[in-house]
């Protein structure tokens, strides 16, 4: 499978990195980053293992990594990672343009 990371998901990742690094330090960020990488690898290996959410548009799947939820969709042989959001965020608001 091919994967494409949206600009929004990339920005989410940068924001997670900045927040975690500033609040908890480099070691915690490195641990969290490893877990996020493992989460992405799991999606690539098992693209239909995610779950649906009522607050995310139809056709999208969610996969939880610690406090964050990776939102993605699968089309043909491509996985589109569209957002990486904190589990306490308002997902409906984040997807109002989709």
Positions of PLM-derived features:
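Basic, Lys/Arg-enriched alpha-helical interface segments
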Residues: 2-54
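Aromatic side chains
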Residues: 19-24, 32, 60, 68, ...
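Basic/aromatic recognition patch in beta-strand/loop cores that engages polyanionic ligands
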Residues: 48-78
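Enriched for short, Lys/Arg-rich terminal
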Residues: 68, 73-98
């Amino acid at each position: 499978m091919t994967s494409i990371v949206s600009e929004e998901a990339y920005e989410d990742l940068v924001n997670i990195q900045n927040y975690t690094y500033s609040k908890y330090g480099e070691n915690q960020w490195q641990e969290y980053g490893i877990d996020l990488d493992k989460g992405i690898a799991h999606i690539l290996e098992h693209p239909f293992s995610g779950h649906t959410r009522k607050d995310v548009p139809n056709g999208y799947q969610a996969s939880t990594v610690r406090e964050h939820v990776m939102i993605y969709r699968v089309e043909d042989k491509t996985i589109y990672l569209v957002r990486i959001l904190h589990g306490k965020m308002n997902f409906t608001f984040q997807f109002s343009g989709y």
